[in-house]
Amino acid sequence: MGLPADAITCAELGCHAISVLTGTLVQDTAGIEHIEAITPELMDDQARCLLEDMPVQAMKVGPLYTTESVSVLAQITADYSDIPLVVHLQRTPDLPLDDDLDADDCHTALFELVLAQADLAVVGHTLLQQWQSHGLLPGSKLDTALDALLDYGVNAVLVTGAPGAGNELTCLLRDEHGQSRRWPAVGGAPVVDADGLLATAITTELARGAEVPDAVDRGLGIARAMAQRVFQPGMGSRIFNRSRS
């Protein structure tokens, strides 16, 4: 889970991952108990140290826990705007991070400051519905939520678990020009951070020079293969089995 899992996934897919912490989590397969946000200064130092040291072909953004960290990320991505950027939009756990922190403020800052610089945002349909019910995004229909995210300037949005024909679930890609493409959902048993693995796989394809639709198509193929390799190591949720044995 988290950065170690992404690093293993990248290595298996033939990419060398470098990482920047945004928070340390006390966590097991059942859930998250505590989050300690990394200071934005440390996050900035680590990111720029790596970016100045070696060529980076693509970036994936995961959870951010303070608006200051979002601001730092926006400055970094603006300085390295030629690097493809994937933003994995996630729900902030219902934990007390800081008395002055509002999770909705972090998401709004991410929408306003970072999405305009992103090539792709990956988000689950259920999360979009939650944000709409809380007023973070307008309306109650999927198209309205997609339009709202695209209005922030992101080039494309990939929605997982989107409703299709009948009871079918799909992955829906919508770009800034209104062009849409659908794939069958990955399927399989529920797994922790399934969308995170998908976003990582897509990022590795962008790093190889693929355009967003092709990267999504190949990333979904990788995710489907990984969905056949899951296990339950503890008392909580299933996770991907990233070992080769």
Language-model features, listed with the residues they occupy:
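Conserved N-terminal subdomain of the carbohydrate kinase-like
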Residues: 3-101, 243-244
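Short, small-residue alpha-helix embedded
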Residues: 130, 189-212, 216
